[in-house]
């Protein structure tokens, strides 16, 4: 069964990468095959935490899509778009750098998918006003999102899994991972002009038009904006405090979305029209296929085969953990991969001869899984959401267009992460 699961996954992945077949149709077809055979049964699909659909991700996405739909009715995205363009004096590069920094910071404090859903509409409006291609902006922002999400415990779901297994606190992530995230973000910002060379030309007349606009006139419903602001603030506080509240982000998001639906008194079409149902179905199909790989022990065997190559050598173990985490997380969702790897890393930590700085293996796992999401268009949930937003806005980004840029960003990010881990934990310690 493992051979069939691998074959179905590879064929489906190839179809998605070809951009010739609708990726949602490909994912659902692959999912239907592994369920029909049956490699994985309906009980596993709908109820298993290890092999089933990650409902936490699905409902978090749905709730934030609804919140963004309600927020869009206020005109606040137009306001922020005009404000950003004016403060940057219409310079596309300055706008991009500002949005990248906001995205990285936001993804450290919130789930990176949430940050993407909030910032992407602003980006599209800015680019529309300046009549420039939004694709480089969207790609740069999602790169920053995946990098920034590694900085804190709440920034990316794999960090929560690692923290639970290793006993790390919120402050542990701040102390150990935030420094390298800052370094990589700065390097990414410096790399962007070269990575997207020629994407920052703008018509001076469009800049003059932007500078003449009054952003306050963009607000259409101030009272609804105040309501949305209060609800969003409460949602964000609950996101950050969820380790204390023991409440999942999806439940918090759904409560926030439900409250906004009630108090906004909008028509159903106003808040459901912007929900990316196709994206949600794509994730469901992807989770089912990855679940089949987990169920047939493919992911576990891959992880164990990698660890046997290290022979207990500390530096080699770190390099392999970082490298394999990067590669595997670029192909399958990093959540099931990290969930599979944590018990193996725990065994490795216990078997290491030198117990003085074994935490390095956990940080290698976290950085590889988080940074590896930038390698391909399906490497992270935020990537898929951003590509769907771009497609809906009439600025489609192909799988290979994203991946070509993602390879450069990931290679540099992982190289810096490897040097950081080596210097901080194996040399300076």
Curated annotation (Swiss-Prot):
<dbReference type="InterPro" id="IPR004680">
    <property type="entry name" value="Cit_transptr-like_dom"/>
</dbReference>
<feature type="transmembrane region" description="Helical">
    <location>
        <begin position="279"/>
        <end position="299"/>
    </location>
</feature>
<dbReference type="InterPro" id="IPR000802">
    <property type="entry name" value="Arsenical_pump_ArsB"/>
</dbReference>
<feature type="transmembrane region" description="Helical">
    <location>
        <begin position="407"/>
        <end position="427"/>
    </location>
</feature>
<protein>
    <recommendedName>
        <fullName>46 kDa membrane protein</fullName>
    </recommendedName>
</protein>
<feature type="transmembrane region" description="Helical">
    <location>
        <begin position="51"/>
        <end position="71"/>
    </location>
</feature>
<feature type="transmembrane region" description="Helical">
    <location>
        <begin position="315"/>
        <end position="335"/>
    </location>
</feature>
<feature type="transmembrane region" description="Helical">
    <location>
        <begin position="360"/>
        <end position="380"/>
    </location>
</feature>
<keyword id="KW-0813">Transport</keyword>
<keyword id="KW-1133">Transmembrane helix</keyword>
<keyword id="KW-1003">Cell membrane</keyword>
<feature type="transmembrane region" description="Helical">
    <location>
        <begin position="173"/>
        <end position="193"/>
    </location>
</feature>
<comment type="similarity">
    <text>Belongs to the CitM (TC 2.A.11) transporter family.</text>
</comment>
<dbReference type="InterPro" id="IPR051475">
    <property type="entry name" value="Diverse_Ion_Transporter"/>
</dbReference>
<feature type="transmembrane region" description="Helical">
    <location>
        <begin position="26"/>
        <end position="46"/>
    </location>
</feature>
<dbReference type="GO" id="GO:0015105">
    <property type="term" value="F:arsenite transmembrane transporter activity"/>
</dbReference>
<feature type="transmembrane region" description="Helical">
    <location>
        <begin position="224"/>
        <end position="244"/>
    </location>
</feature>
<keyword id="KW-0472">Membrane</keyword>
<dbReference type="GO" id="GO:0005886">
    <property type="term" value="C:plasma membrane"/>
</dbReference>
<keyword id="KW-0812">Transmembrane</keyword>
<dbReference type="Pfam" id="PF03600">
    <property type="entry name" value="CitMHS"/>
</dbReference>
<feature type="transmembrane region" description="Helical">
    <location>
        <begin position="99"/>
        <end position="119"/>
    </location>
</feature>
């Amino acid at each position: 069964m493992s051979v069939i699961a691998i074959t179905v996954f590879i064929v489906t992945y190839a179809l998605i990468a070809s951009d010739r077949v609708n990726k949602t149709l490909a994912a659902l077809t692959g999912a239907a095959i592994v369920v029909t055979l049956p490699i994985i049964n309906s009980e596993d699909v709908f109820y298993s935490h290890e092999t089933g659909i990650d409902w936490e991700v699905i409902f978090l996405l749905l709730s934030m899509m609804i919140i963004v739909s309600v927020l869009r009715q206020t005109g606040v995205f137009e306001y922020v778009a005009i404000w950003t363009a004016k403060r940057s004096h219409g310079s596309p590069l300055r706008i991009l750098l500002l949005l990248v920094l906001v995205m990285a910071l936001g993804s450290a404090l919130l789930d990176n998918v949430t940050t993407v859903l909030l910032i992407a509409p602003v980006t599209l409006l800015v680019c529309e006003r300046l009549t420039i291609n939004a694709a480089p902006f969207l790609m740069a922002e999602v790169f920053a999102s995946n990098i920034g999400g590694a900085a804190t415990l709440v920034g990316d779901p794999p960090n929560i899994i690692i923290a639970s297994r290793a006993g790390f606190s919120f402050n542990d992530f701040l102390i150990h991972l935030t420094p390298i995230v800052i370094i990589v973000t700065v390097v990414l910002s410096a790399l962007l002009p070269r990575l997207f060379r020629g994407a920052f030309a703008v018509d001076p007349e469009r800049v003059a038009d932007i500078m003449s606009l009054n952003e306050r006139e963009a607000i259409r419903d101030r009272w609804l904006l105040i309501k949305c602001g209060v609800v969003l603030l409460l949602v964000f506080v609950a996101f950050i405090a969820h380790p204390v509240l023991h409440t999942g982000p999806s439940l918090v998001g759904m409560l926030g979305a439900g409250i906004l639906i009630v108090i906004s008194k909008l028509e159903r079409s106003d808040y459901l029209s912007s929900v990316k149902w196709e994206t949600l179905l794509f994730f469901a199909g992807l989770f089912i296929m990855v679940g089949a790989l987990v169920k047939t022990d493919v992911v576990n065997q891959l992880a164990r085969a990698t660890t046997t190559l290290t022979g207990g050598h500390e530096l080699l173990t770190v390099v392999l953990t970082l490298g394999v985490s990067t590669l595997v997380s670029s192909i399958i969702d990093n959540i099931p991969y990290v969930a599979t790897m944590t018990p193996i890393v725990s065994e490795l930590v216990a078997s290491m001869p030198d117990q003085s700085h074994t935490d390095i293996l956990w940080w290698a796992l976290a950085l590889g899984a988080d940074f590896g999401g930038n390698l391909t268009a399906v490497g992270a949930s935020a990537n898929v959401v951003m590509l769907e937003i771009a497609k809906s806005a009439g600025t489609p980004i192909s799988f290979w267009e994203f991946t070509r840029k993602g390879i450069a960003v990931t290679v540099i990010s992982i190289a810096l992460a490897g040097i950081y881990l080596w210097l901080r934990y194996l040399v300076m310690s």
